[in-house]
Amino acid sequence: MKKNPKKLKTWSALKRERFTKNPDEAFAYLKSSLEENSDAPEIVIEAIRLVSESLGLSIEQIAKKAHKSPSTIHKALGKTGNPTLETLSAVLKTMGLKLTIAKAS
């Protein structure tokens, strides 16, 4: 009998599973991502996308809650996303989060 090889999961899939079970860890990951990668917005956007997915939020759900069009949210959270501060703030609000400012160390 042949054994079924286990499918390897991507890093993102593993994180998504873990964050689904522990939303506080997801928020800590997102905060850390922003603090450590403020000069690499694509990494921060990827983290926001990952956390929103782990919370079960679709693009359409985020758009509705953020009072934005789905295409705006899709572009904002896409691989080349560059959301406005207003859109970013609205997306974070749908996840129960807000932007804050801290003094750089």
Predicted features and spans:
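DNA major-groove recognition helix of helix-turn-helix/homeodomain DNA-binding modules
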Residues: E86-A102
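Residues that mark the N-terminal boundary/hinge immediately upstream of a DNA-recognition element
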Residues: S58, T84-T87
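N-terminal flexible/basic segments that precede or flank functional cores
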Residues: M1-L50, S54
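Short, charged recognition helix plus adjacent turn
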Residues: K7-K9, T100-S105
